[in-house]
Amino acid sequence: MAWIPLFLGVLAYCTGSVASYELTQPPSVSVSPGQTASITCSGDKLGDKYACWYQQKPGQSPVLVIYQDSKRPSGIPERFSGSNSGNTATLTISGTQAMDEADYYCQAWDSSTAH
């Protein structure tokens, strides 16, 4: 059985109004193709901020896959979804595919200044 490793940024720091705000992710997640992957990102009162998620494949620039907690940019498959509540934001990949193997990074910013 094949496994899809999803490597995660251990810490992510954001600029602007939440400079030095620390986000913590688990080191890695592995799932079988077709299964659901849930990748978490934790930070103090993260639910009061907007969370976004980037996917980065080797040798490529990061691609935004989720913004404002749960919105998908044009061209991002519906299998990518996001949520954010309390101290945890979650990126969910339903029905993972081999092409989803990548690094995933979370980022946060103050929702009161994001408009």
From Swiss-Prot:
User: GO:BP terms for this protein?
Assistant: adaptive immune response; immune response
User: Could you tell me the superkingdom of the organism this chain comes from?
Assistant: Eukaryota
Q: Which GO terms describe its cellular component?
A: extracellular region; immunoglobulin complex; plasma membrane
What cystine pairs are annotated? 41-106
Annotated compartments: Secreted; Cell membrane
Q: Which InterPro entries match?
A: Ig-like_dom, Ig-like_dom_sf, Ig-like_fold, Ig_sub, Ig_V-set, IgV_Light_Chain
Q: Where is the signal peptide?
A: 1-20
Chain segments carrying region Complementarity-determining-2: 68-70
What segment(s) does the record annotate as region Complementarity-determining-3? 107-115
* Region called Framework-2, residue ranges: 51-67
- Spell out the residue ranges making up region: Framework-1: 20-41
Question: Per its record, what are the GO molecular function terms?
Answer: antigen binding
Locate the region Complementarity-determining-1: 42-50
Domain Ig-like residues, every copy: 21-115
Asked if the keyword Protein transport belongs to this entry, the reply reads no
Gene3D superfamilies reported for this sequence = Immunoglobulins (2.60.40.10)
Q: Where are the transmembrane segments?
A: none
- The principal localisation class reads secreted
Keyword list, A-Z: Adaptive immunity, Cell membrane, Disulfide bond, Immunity, Immunoglobulin, Immunoglobulin domain, Membrane, Secreted, Signal
Where is the region Framework-3?
Answer: 71-106
One of the Pfam families matching this protein, by short name = V-set
Q: How does it assemble?
A: Immunoglobulins are composed of two identical heavy chains and two identical light chains; disulfide-linked.
By its UniProt entry, which PANTHER family does this protein fall under? Answer: IMMUNOGLOBULIN LIGHT CHAIN
Purpose of the protein: V region of the variable domain of immunoglobulin light chains that participates in the antigen recognition. Immunoglobulins, also known as antibodies, are membrane-bound or secreted glycoproteins produced by B lymphocytes. In the recognition phase of humoral immunity, the membrane-bound immunoglobulins serve as receptors which, upon binding of a specific antigen, trigger the clonal expansion and differentiation of B lymphocytes into immunoglobulins-secreting plasma cells.
**Full protein name:** Immunoglobulin lambda variable 3-1
Taxonomy, top ranks, is: Eukaryota, Metazoa, Chordata, Craniata, Vertebrata
* Encoding gene (name): IGLV3-1
